[in-house]
């Protein structure tokens, strides 16, 4: 259920209606940071399939077509951030493979603090969660700068085509257009 302030949940809580809820391509009205802490699997983000595993962070902007399958043994946290808030989130999906123990510890500490705050449900929870989201945003932008060498310099033509197609499907699927209209 979408919230007016950022929320943290486990992958199991996030897909509580069943694994299909995360495994089938869909989009969400809010930004999400997914932190995988156990297991491995596949993610489809913006039409591009990627392998995910332990210490991977996925940043999914609001309205991005995605699917996530980490299997039954997978575990992780999902931090959902409503768009238009204090936290600045990237416009493009990000897949960060955090090999540095310091970066892993920083992210874990931020998420642990969020979880403690959310579980105590004290007054001004919304303000506290927005402040934590802003801190996470700073950490994320710093980490993205540190990982610029990990990303390919330029996506291939096939990746650009499938990303554009996925964005078109996400934008127009509610209109009832037949598939033939998307092939033009």
Regions found by a protein language model. Give the residues of each.
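Generic protein-terminus/edge-of-domain signal
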Residues: 1-53
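A hydrophobic/aromatic-rich effector-binding and dimerization subdomain
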Residues: 1-11, 65-121, 137-146
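Tight coil/turn sites that cap or link beta-strands
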Residues: 19-20, 54-55, 61-63, 73, ...
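Regular secondary-structure segments
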Residues: 37, 108-119, 166, 170-173
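Short beta-strand His + acidic residue motifs that chelate non-heme Fe in jelly-roll/DSBH
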Residues: 42-44, 52, 60, 66-71
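Append "Primarily bacterial transcriptional regulators
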Residues: 55, 181-184
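Short, Lys/Arg-enriched, Trp-marked, Pro/Gly-tolerant hinge/linker segments that flank
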Residues: 97-102, 121-128, 140-181
